[in-house]
C-alpha cells in the first residue's frame, strides 16, 4: 500500500504502489497494489479488505506510512499537527484495529509499527511527527500485551533510511543508508520465527540495536517537600543501574509493584526501628 502523495501527504498517485507490486510479481511473488489512505478509518479498512479479498487472510501487518509537515512549535498549525497524526499514529490504529481481531481469531499474527528517533529523542520543527511516533510505541505495547495469549506479536522498528521522505535534506555526508539496511530487521520481526513482542528495534546505517524505556532506581521517602526533591535530585536522576520493565508480560504492573514494595520495605524498616526504640 502506498498512497503515492507528496511529503506533506497531499495528492494521490497509484504509481509507487503499482511499481513495487510489479517488482514483487516479477520476482516470483504475489502482490496487489492499493492506494487507499491510512489517514481515515475507511482507508484503513479498505487496505485490510484488499488483503483479505486477494489472499484470504492477514498474517503480517507492517505500518510504515508517513508524511512530514515542518514548522517550529511556535508556528505549527493545528491543521499540520493533525495531518501528521492522521497518518502516523491514527493511521497505525486504522489498520491495526481491523487486522488485530482477525489475527487473534486465527491464533497467529505479526505486527510491525514504525517509530522514529524523532519520537524517542525529539527533533526540532517536527512536534507533530515526534508526538505521533512516540504514540506508536504505546499502541504497540497494548497490541503486544493483548495479543500475547493469541499468538499475535507486535514490535516497533525505529529506522533511518534515505527514502522519498528525505527529499530536501543534504545527505551527501551520510554513510550508506539504503532501505536494504532496514528491511531485514522488519523481515525478521514479521517472520514466524520472531520470538519477541513488545520491543523496539533500531536500524540505522547498518547498526541494529534494541531500545528500551528505563528508570532510575529512585529515592523513597514517606513524605516530600519541594526542597527535599531539590536536595535528592542527584540520587533521583542516578541511572547507572537502570530499571527496565518490559511491556510483556506485565511491565505496567511490575512498575507499580516495584514502587509499592519499596514503600512497604521502608515502612517495615522504620516500624522495626521505632519498635526497637520503644523497647529500649
Regions found by a protein language model. Give the residues of each.
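The beta1-alpha1 cofactor-binding region of Rossmann-like NAD(H)/NADP(H)-dependent oxidoreductases
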Residues: 14-18, 35-46, 78
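Substrate-binding pocket helix/loop in short-chain dehydrogenase/reductase
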Residues: 24, 72-73, 80-85
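A glycine-rich helix->loop->beta "capping" turn
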Residues: 27-30, 50-63, 69-72, 108, ...
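Active-site loop immediately N-terminal to the catalytic Tyr-X3-Lys motif
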Residues: 74, 121-128, 149
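Active-site helix of classical SDR
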Residues: 96, 132, 140
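Residue(s) in the substrate-gating loop at a strand-loop-helix junction
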Residues: 116
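C-terminal helical subdomain
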Residues: 156, 174-278
Amino acid at each position: 500500500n502506498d498512497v503515492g502523495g507528496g511529503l506533506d501527504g497531499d495528492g494521490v498517485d497509484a504509481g509507487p504502489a503499482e511499481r513495487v507490486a510489479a517488482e514483487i510479481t516479477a520476482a516470483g511473488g504475489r502482490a496487489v497494489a492499493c492506494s487507499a489512505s491510512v489517514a481515515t478509518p475507511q482507508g484503513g479498512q479498505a487496505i485490510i479488505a484488499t488483503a483479505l479479498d486477494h489472499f484470504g487472510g492477514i498474517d503480517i501487518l507492517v505500518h510504515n506510512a508517513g508524511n512530514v509537515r515542518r514548522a517550529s512549535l511556535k508556528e505549527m498549525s493545528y491543521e499540520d499537527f493533525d495531518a501528521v497524526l492522521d497518518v502516523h499514529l491514527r493511521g497505525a490504529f486504522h489498520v491495526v484495529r481491523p487486522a488485530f481481531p482477525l489475527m487473534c481469531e486465527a491464533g497467529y499474527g505479526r505486527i510491525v509499527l514504525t517509530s522514529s528517533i524523532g519520537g524517542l529523542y525529539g527533533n526540532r520543527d517536527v512536534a507533530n511527527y515526534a508526538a505521533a511516533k512516540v504514540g506508536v510505541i504505546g499502541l504497540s505495547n497494548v497490541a503486544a500485551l493483548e495479543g500475547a495469549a493469541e499468538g499475535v506479536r507486535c514490535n516497533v522498528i525505529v529506522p533511518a533510511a534515505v527514502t522519498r521522505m528525505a527529499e530536501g535534506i543534504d545527505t551527501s555526508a551520510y554513510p550508506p543508508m539504503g532501505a536494504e539496511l532496514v528491511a531485514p530487521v522488519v523481515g525478521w520481526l514479521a517472520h514466524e520465527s520472531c520470538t519477541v513482542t513488545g520491543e523496539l528495534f533500531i536500524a540505522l546505517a547498518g547498526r541494529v540495536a534494541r531500545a528500551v524505556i528505563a528508570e532510575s532506581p529512585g529515592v523513597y521517602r514517606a513524605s516530600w517537600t519541594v526542597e527535599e526533591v531539590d536536595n535528592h535530585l542527584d540520587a533521583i536522576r542516578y541511572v547507572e543501574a537502570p530499571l527496565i520493565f518490559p511491556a510483556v508480560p506485565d511491565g505496567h504492573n511490575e512498575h507499580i509493584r516495584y514502587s509499592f514494595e519499596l514503600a512497604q520495605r521502608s515502612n517495615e524498616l522504620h516500624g522495626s526501628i521505632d519498635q526497637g526504640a520503644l523497647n529500649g
